[in-house]
Amino acid sequence: MKKHLIYLTIFLLQLTAIGQEKYNSLFWEISGNGLKEPSYLYGTMHSQDDRVFQFKKGVMNAFNHAEIYAMELNMDSVDQVALLSKLIMDSTHSLKTLLTEDEYTIVSDFFRDSLGQALFMFEKMQPLFTSQMVTLRDLEAQQTDALDIYFFKEAKKQKKQTIGLEKTKEQIDAFSAIPYTLQAKGLVDAVKNYGKEGELDMDTMMKYYVEGNLDKLLEMTTEYDEEDKGDEEMAKIFNDIFLIKRNHNMACRAEPFIKKGSTFIAVGAAHLPGEEGIIELLRKKGYKVIAR
């Protein structure tokens, strides 16, 4: 369960067939189908690690040339009111109703001792969002200068048109689709496994990311414990809602902009590969998408 929290945090973020082609690049060129000039697709990772900024030759040239910068959420138009309202569980649920007394004590002690926070402050918050605090702390990930933020700031400096391929409510609703009971289990697992699995998973994920090995990233995303029905259910929800549905939305919404002018699209790397990944969805629309 915890590894899915890691993926949500980093790719924020498929059980589809991978097929014969190897997705071995983070950087893809989109052309053909009447486009006047090429656009570009880049798989990001929400990380400050220096390695994610070691771009392949041509990435920054493509970024600098692009007239439009497209990301998952346009930071200029994030709806804070919608965000805050969606963080709250309905009136019949709270952490105390979802956790056993022992589980509540474990989580409460962890928040007090490791995070310096009182758990009652998060009593009505959806557990998955609370889990993000644990996962981010475990990975020592501070969100200020992560790769996606870096691209956004550079786009603003260059006065590019910046657009979001998703709406705040859509991303929040994806989280809300996970039953509270599964969210609560994920929170307890994250606390119990703090400092044990996260570092190993992150090292492996970073290795595949730096290699541009999207196939392996996709494989990590689809893994689940077959003996844990909750983990299997979480994996299916992650696949259907966090990836497939969002992939279709982003591919459709990107199309008017790549027709308008050269667009640099930067989205989580997990959204690129697979039969229903953005690469294949754009190809099905008639575009030529090749690794650069």
Give the residues covered by each predicted segment:
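Bacterial Sec-dependent N-terminal signal peptides
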Residues: 1-28
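Short, glycine/serine-rich, charged loops/turns that create anion-binding
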Residues: 12, 46, 270-271
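A conditional alpha-helix N-cap/helix-loop micro-motif detector
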Residues: 20, 52, 144, 243-247
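Residues that act as N-cap/strand-start positions at coil-to-secondary-structure junctions
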Residues: 22-24, 149, 248
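Structured, acidic catalytic/metal-binding patches in enzyme active sites
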Residues: 29-233, 238
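A cross-kingdom marker for long, charged
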Residues: 232, 236-292
